[in-house]
Structure formats: C-alpha cells, structure tokens
C-alpha cells in the first residue's frame, strides 16, 4: 500500500491562532495538558486538537529573529529543545516560550555532558571513555531551520533540534549532528555530496502497561490479530489504516518527507521510506519521525 505524503484522515481541522482550543499563558509554571488524538475519533471528555497543515507547517526559518517572530505569531506556549544522544534517543528540555527566547540571546540552555552519552536504558557508567571525567555542562544551541509544531499536543507547542557546544564555543565532538557534519565536510572536500533516502521499519504493538508481560500484536480493522508472515501484503497493511493515516498527517504537519509504505515480514511490522534528500536534513527528519510513530 502506497500512501502519498498529502494523504488526509477524517480528523477535524482548524487553526491554533483563531480556533477555540484552550490556550495557556506563555511562561506560566503550570504545564499545558497533553493529549494524543486519533484520526476520526473525538473524546467526550476532551476536545480533539484542531490544526491546519498549511497554516502550521512553518516556512524556512533561517535566523533567530524570524524564529522569535514565528513563535509569537502562532502563540506557541512551550518549546521542546531536542538533541539526539549517541544512540539516537531524544534528550533535552521543555522551556516556556519567553524563557526560550531569552535563552536565544544568551549562551543557550545548559545540560550535563553525560546527557548525550547514555545507553538506551539510561546508563552512563562508562562515559569517561568519551567525555571529560568531570560532568561538565554543555550548551544547547537551537537550529532555527528545524523548528516544527508538535501536532498532537492540546496547547500550541514547538519542537526544535539543537546543536551541542562547549563553553569554549566549540562543537561537542561526540554529538551526533557534529559527527555527521564532519563526515559531510569530508565528502565536500572531495567535491561530493551524499544524497540519502533511508527506510524505517517498526512494529505496532498492543498497549501494554505491565513491563513483566510480553508485547502483543494489536487487533486490526478486521477485529483479528495477525498470526503469520505477510511480507508486502496489501490487506495486511490495510489492517492498520487508522494509525497509518495519523502518522502521515503528523509527518506532513512536521514537514517530514515520507513516501511509500509496505508491510514487512513480521506481524504488524511496517516499513516507511523517506524521500531522497540532504543527509543532515533527512537525519533530522528520521530523528523526529521516531517520536511521531
């Protein structure tokens, strides 16, 4: 099954600046309520988020002034400042809008260096093999071109990818974006530019709140669970249309350039292909896609 990037679900759409979605006061200590909304469904207890994909896919923002203007124009309440650690896990801070704007005019937001050197389970016992023996601070510097909305939140919230810098103004050499940048510079020195198009494979699983229980295969639209292998099965892929449509809608809102979808060999295992593009841009998109899916 191939679904174009512009695929639409049945979700109700509106727009944050002019909609009746409850807004929070920027900078207030109270955190905004969060809710994950499923395409085509509306909770009686809480209104489903309304967003306009054309209105909320931000233009290319090249500098800090344009970023500040966009944050205020679209009534962004909080900014999620994100960095990938060495395993690609999302690390960072959630900052009220005006505090984030203040940080743009200073050295940026500080995090401990070990934040980037954790295992997938959060262990960092061996970080001194990579970083300094002292758990020193590093600085998160937002890349304005990466700012996107978080379309599944009730309050207007932005997400932005940050680079990591030392107090001496040098890039943190083991930060993933810095590593990739050095690789790209090596290619550029030889007159080459990588063009990449990764594919991401993942499993859909039944909701599980008990860590002692194994993950299960979810029930599809037919009311049944997959029991065998269905590589490239069309009907097998269609079993999960509701969540697939939602993924494509959220990717469009976040300007994540995905294309073809296929069912892989495992039960409820899907594969989504990214469109060809610049290596850094695609790496950023894959990083954001992992939280979308």
What residues fall within each predicted segment?
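Short, conserved phosphate-binding/catalytic loop or strand-edge motifs used
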Residues: 200, 264-272
């Amino acid at each position: 099954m191939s679904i174009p990037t512009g695929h639409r679900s049945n979700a109700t759409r509106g727009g944050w600046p002019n909609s009746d979605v409850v807004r929070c006061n920027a900078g207030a200590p109270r955190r905004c309520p969060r809710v994950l909304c499923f395409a085509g469904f509306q909770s009686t207890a809480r209104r489903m988020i309304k967003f306009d994909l054309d209105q909320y896919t931000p233009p290319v923002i090249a500098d800090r002034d344009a970023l500040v203007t966009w944050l205020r124009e679209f009534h962004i309440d909080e900014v999620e400042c994100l960095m990938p650690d060495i395993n690609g896990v999302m690390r960072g801070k959630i900052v009220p809008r005006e505090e984030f704007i203040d940080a743009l005019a200073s050295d940026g937001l500080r995090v401990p260096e070990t934040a980037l050197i954790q295992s997938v389970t959060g262990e960092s016992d061996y970080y001194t093999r990579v970083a300094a023996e002292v758990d020193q601070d590093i600085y998160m510097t937002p890349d304005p071109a990466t700012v996107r909305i978080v379309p599944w939140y009730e309050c207007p919230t932005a997400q932005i990818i940050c680079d990591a810098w030392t107090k001496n103004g040098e890039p943190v050499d083991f930060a993933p974006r810095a590593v990739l940048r050095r690789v790209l510079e090596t290619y550029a020195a030889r007159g080459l530019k990588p063009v990449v198009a990764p594919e991401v494979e993942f499993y859909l699983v039944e909701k599980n709140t008990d860590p002692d229980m194994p993950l299960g295969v979810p029930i599809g639209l037919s009311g049944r669970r997959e029991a065998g292998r269905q590589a490239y099965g069309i009907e097998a892929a269609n079993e999960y249309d509701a969540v697939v449509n939602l993924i494509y809608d959220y990717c469009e809102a976040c300007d994540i350039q995905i294309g073809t979808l296929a069912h892989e060999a495992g039960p409820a295992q899907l594969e989504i292909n990214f469109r060809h593009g610049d290596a850094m841009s695609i790496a950023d998109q894959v990083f954001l896609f992992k939280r979308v899916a």
